Regions:
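A short, Lys/Arg-enriched interface patch at domain edges and termini
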Residues: 49-79
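Short intrinsically disordered terminal tails
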Residues: 1, 78-82
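Short Lys/Arg-enriched helix C-cap and helix-to-coil transition segments
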Residues: 34-41
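Short, solvent-exposed alpha-helical "recognition" segments
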Residues: 27-34
């Protein structure tokens, strides 16, 4: 499992601006970043690839919001299985 920084996340989506990712987060269409330092955030690579695959598959915004909720829930279970 890797942690991707914002430039890598933008590249995965083809976005040019930071705001496009943060707007997607506010809309519930992307997971929130995880703290990797006092001021640094990153995104688990499997979350980014899962969300990109959902977009490619033509999933609706409602489906993607449900997927985002499931990915956030999965984060809490990761520690229990480690």
């Amino acid at each position: 499992m890797l942690i991707l920084r914002l430039p890598e996340v933008k590249r995965a989506y083809g976005h040019k601006s930071d705001a496009s990712i943060y707007n997607a987060i506010r809309a519930g269409l992307h997971t929130t970043g995880v703290a990797i330092g006092q001021r640094a955030r990153g995104w688990p690579d499997y979350e980014v690839s899962t969300l990109v695959a959902a977009r490619i598959a033509g999933k609706s915004d409602a489906d993607i919001r449900a997927l985002v909720n499931a990915l956030h829930a999965k984060r809490t279970g990761l520690l229990a299985t480690a």
